[in-house]
Amino acid sequence: MKIKEIGFVGIPVTDMAKARAFYENILGLKPDPEMTGEKWTEYPIGTGVVAIANVGGDWRPSDQGTAAALEVESLEGAIARLNEHNIRYDQVESPVCRMAIIQDPDGNKLIVHKLKPENKKGSDV
């Protein structure tokens, strides 16, 4: 098997209206009008997609395990926006990036992420 790219990251939610308000109004994501419905909404980001879904069954929100890392233009700007909306976060710095770890209204972990300039893909370092 040869995996070419990530098709989408799926995030389970329990309340689509509340989740959409968070992903659109706080994170600033724009929904794809052709992929928006009562139980599924997709947000194109670069060449990828973040999808939120309320499909029930065994696919439930969790703060354990996988977290999507969303690269931002400015971590300082993102943190200001999180503060403006009273979103709690843990700020972490690694050798390659800076990030704020947050949770959506269902408790799913998300990472607001900014690579340090010397670690950008395609750099000579």
In which residue ranges do the predicted regions lie?
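Short secondary-structure boundary/capping segments
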Residues: 1, 32-33, 41-42, 57-61, ...
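N-terminal beta-strand motif that seeds the catalytic metal site of vicinal oxygen chelate
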Residues: 1-18, 47, 66-68, 116-125
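Core segments of cupin and vicinal oxygen chelate
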Residues: 10-50
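Vicinal oxygen chelate
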Residues: 16, 68-109
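Conserved beta-strand edge residues that scaffold enzyme active sites
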Residues: 37-38, 95-96, 121
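Active-site beta-strand termini and strand-to-loop segments that position acidic
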Residues: 43-48, 102-105, 115
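Short, charged/polar, Gly/Pro-enriched secondary-structure boundary elements
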Residues: 48-51, 60, 106-110
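Acetyl-CoA-dependent GNAT
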Residues: 53-57, 93, 114-118
